[in-house]
């Protein structure tokens, strides 16, 4: 497992990808993840170059283990996130505590894990390209790293609204018009 880092571009976020499942090799995850993370940060008026995200590209078995270990749900899921800091809002539906780009401790936003089998199955069931679904999940996961969640209706409305806005900047359709299973 050798992490790959996107080509050095001073205006872009650093996205490190560790690929454990060769099925991910068919998708240009490096470019896709870079665009998704950058678009998320720009939408929140954060300079991408100030931040880092790490992604584990794994299979369903590995993510089921992680899901069981960290969430008590030993089943596959599409994406998991581990924020480097707790940025949760003070009240449901409120804005999270976004990082200060000038704070060197804020640089590492956290880690994401994506399961190829689950992502591919969900994309096929929804009739959407895998790249679009994975882009959405990286945007979704990056928002979790920044303190957004969907535990309450108010939080979900805020987070989903942002996801739609961000995906539109990437010329992608609203993923909530046809629910992903």
Swiss-Prot record:
InterPro entries: MetalPrtase_cat_dom_sf_prd (IPR023091), YbeY (IPR002036), YbeY_CS (IPR020549). Zn(2+) binds at residues 140, 144, 150. Its EC number is 3.1.-.-. It is found in: Cytoplasm. Pfam families: YbeY (PF02130). Keywords: Cytoplasm, Endonuclease, Hydrolase, Metal-binding, Nuclease, Ribosome biogenesis, rRNA processing, Zinc. Binds 1 zinc ion. Gene3D superfamilies: Metalloproteases ('zincins'), catalytic domain (3.40.390.30). Its cofactor is Zn(2+). GO terms for molecular function: metalloendopeptidase activity; RNA endonuclease activity; zinc ion binding. Single strand-specific metallo-endoribonuclease involved in late-stage 70S ribosome quality control and in maturation of the 3' terminus of the 16S rRNA. This is Endoribonuclease YbeY. The gene is ybeY.
